[in-house]
A protein has these predicted regions:
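Aromatic- and Gly/Pro-enriched helix-to-coil junctions and flexible linker segments
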Residues: 2-130
């Protein structure tokens, strides 16, 4: 299976989700009735070529603040404020730098593209300038 940049169809959320159906030769065997739930969800991310500046990362971090308002209670005044990252550089570097398989990986929903994560980490490593 191959996937290509979907071109940001959902604007504020990375990528596009596709359901891919499949069958196998046992589907014709009465002992193995077809399963109508036989599908694989595939998340294909759009590319992101922003620079490691607040102007580039701010819009998608503000979207995360809207999607996950609970995080604002952990980091007042909220994820949409660059000072939050400036004050918590080590914490954000550690969770954003983990392998995606790690349960502590952020965002926990695994819905941030590799490109945006790379730019975000570069911005944080630069001191999260506002």
């Amino acid at each position: 299976m191959y996937a290509y940049d979907p071109g940001n169809p959902r604007e504020f959320i990375d990528g596009q989700v596709y359901a891919v159906g499949f069958t196998w030769d046992k589907d014709n065997d009465p002992a193995f009735p077809p399963d109508s739930n036989g599908a694989v969800s595939v998340l294909v991310f759009d590319s992101f070529k922003g620079k490691p500046t607040w102007a580039s990362v701010g819009p998608f971090l503000s979207q995360y603040a809207k999607l996950y308002p609970f995080m604002d209670s952990l980091f007042p005044p909220g994820l949409g404020d660059p000072q939050v990252y400036q004050k918590n550089i080590r914490a954000f570097e550690s969770v954003l730098g983990l392998p995606i398989e790690d349960p502590r990986y952020m965002p926990v929903t695994r819905d941030m593209s590799r490109d945006k994560r790379k730019v975000l980490l570069a911005w944080i490593k630069a001191g999260a300038p506002g």
